[in-house]
UniProtKB/Swiss-Prot annotation:
SMART domains in the cross-refs: S4
EC numbers, comma separated: 6.1.1.1
A Pfam family that the UniProt record links to this protein: tRNA-synt_1b
Ligand binding (ATP): 229
Protein name: Tyrosine--tRNA ligase
Family to which the UniProt record says this protein belongs: Belongs to the class-I aminoacyl-tRNA synthetase family. TyrS type 2 subfamily.
Annotated function: Catalyzes the attachment of tyrosine to tRNA(Tyr) in a two-step reaction: tyrosine is first activated by ATP to form Tyr-AMP and then transferred to the acceptor end of tRNA(Tyr).
Subunit-level organization: Homodimer.
PROSITE patterns named in the record: AA_TRNA_LIGASE_I, S4
GO cellular component labels: cytosol
Amino acid sequence: MTDINTVLAELKRGTDEILSEADLIEKLKENRPLKVKLGADPTAPDIHLGHTVVLNKLRQFQQLGHEVYFLIGDFTGMVGDPSGKNATRPPLSREDVLRNAETYKEQIYKILDPQKTKIVFNSEWLSKLGTXGMIRLASNYTVARMLERDDFKKRFGNNQPIAIHEFIYPLLQGYDSVALDADVELGGTDQKFNLLVGRELQKSAGKKPQVAITLPLLVGLDGEKKMSKSLGNYIGVTEAPSDMFGKVMSISDELMWDWYNLLSFRPLNEIAQLKSEVENGKNPRDVKILLAKELIARFHNEEAANAAEQEFINRFQKGAMPDEMPEFTFSGEMGLATLLKEAGLVPSTSEAIRSAQQGGVKINGEKVDNVKDNAPKGTNVYQVGKRKFARVRLNKVDTVK
């Protein structure tokens, strides 16, 4: 077996917490394939780069010879995960959950080895719990302990409603670990409480508690909030190569390094070298291109990555896109013509309409004919004429976080 310290260093890369590291070392010393679990409720049909942070860690365990379980929460998806929310999350219908689950299976194989990945659905055991089983499960935790969760604590303090089924959700996710006899569970930092519930329920069931490994949440294209389809600040793993390339190139230079740390498979010393080169005068755009190509090659292929780079060069650099440009941040619904005016690209909305009719308005290099539509959410590069550019981040106004 590979030296445990070497394996541990590899597994720790990019993690936020390992609870506990001592337990993980003990399990690794047993020199057996560990059961490593990652669960996801199929609340939307697309998997985006934010999801791949934990999927990449699951892949790492897989490459080290461990058993990986991708758990699709078809049962819990109909309950609704309250993690990080400031209001009750609406549950999905059975039909929505199953439809989204099918697309999940296809997309995770862009990262995981289909021959070595076990896909399980938690309805297999949760639907059999029944009323008596659910009551026994609920008896393992108190309301006081549930209110230790930051999101519940904030909502309770703000007199915002918390539905009973939201207290049940962490117990259901924790019971998944009991049913699978998981050795390790992965999740984002917002899942820490749920992962620790799994440890406690395993102890109550007389099993060895799982190791909980949390990973940072990937900040989305807006540079502020976690990547989320509902916020429009995401890149889906099935998006066209040219779209992926353009979106990666739109992120800020500061955010680029966070993405390198969480998404790139490059050795850490290589990333440090790239950062040093930028600090010494290398154009960060060139380093961003390397990241864009790495991600496109992973989710498509190298040929697609090279083609996307060439298209970007033809579209932007030959069009004299500047390395630096004004940056703006707006929130809420905004008409494209208004956005162009507010960003200083046109003196009036009527001028925006006229410029578009003459083919002079572009978003990420693509011509836009109708500026009467709403501007897209997220971060995009807007161009009017040959020399006016602005990078604009349009945030969605949150109602449910």
